[in-house]
Regions:
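A short alpha-helix/helix-coil micro-patch that ends at or immediately precedes a cysteine
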Residues: 10-111
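Low-complexity, Pro/Thr/Ser/Gly/Ala-rich linker/spacer regions in secreted
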Residues: 16, 196-204
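Short, well-ordered helical secondary-structure segments
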Residues: 5, 16, 61, 68, ...
């Protein structure tokens, strides 16, 4: 078990930058959900950044990332988006789901191996009904790359995070982006079929 780490602090400039990224992330998610065939083109354009050792080196990233499946996982994701994915409706931002995403992010900032008590957190800012999904992505800084990574789900043959992004029953979402002591950055996305914000969510979001 990893020792708990103090939460990373951000200044006002970073906070504004992170909010911008969160907005961009939701935009990317909705592009993916509503037009998967077009999103496949983004992944195709990025496939060229693999070397012959399964290392992904994007020119805008500080360092390369060694992957488990290499470009083959990109090919599989492209095929899925072009030939199998069914477009689903865009997600609407929820204040309560946003707060929930930040609570989860805060737990992972303190302990990367944290066992999140979702049952305890889910009712903190509102009332849930129907489907619920939560996905995390460690390390990436650029919104497009974050969503590509979730779609590709390198090393996870179940592609569970991809399935979560395409959950047809989801209607609302929350997005949190922040620093991480080990992986530099962390993204948490929460989605629900129906979520009714409580007063606390409206006051604190």
């Amino acid at each position: 078990m990893t020792d708990k780490k103090p939460e990373e602090k951000v200044d006002d400039k970073e906070k504004a930058e992170f909010i911008e990224k969160e907005n961009a992330l939701l935009k990317e998610i909705n592009e993916l959900r509503t037009n998967p065939k077009a999103y496949a083109e983004k992944i195709e354009k990025n496939k060229k950044y693999f070397d012959d050792k399964n290392v992904y080196r994007h020119p805008e990233d500080q360092a390369g990332v060694r992957t488990k499946e290499g470009a083959e996982a990109y090919d599989e994701a492209i095929d899925f988006l072009k030939n199998k994915a069914v477009p689903v409706e865009a997600l609407v931002r929820s204040k309560g789901l946003n707060k929930l995403a930040f609570d989860i992010l805060s737990e992972y900032q303190k302990n990367v191996d944290a066992e999140i008590d979702l049952d305890g957190l889910m009712g903190k800012y509102g009332k849930f009904a129907g489907a619920f999904r939560e996905v995390c992505q460690f390390g990436s800084y650029r919104p497009e790359q974050i969503i590509i990574n979730l779609v590709v789900s390198d090393g996870d043959k179940t592609r569970g995070q991809r399935d979560a992004l395409f959950e047809a029953g989801l209607k609302q979402a929350g997005v949190a982006f922040g620093k991480h002591d080990i992986y530099k950055f962390l993204t948490v996305i929460t989605g629900s079929a129906k979520y009714e914000n409580t007063v606390d969510a409206d006051d604190t979001a």
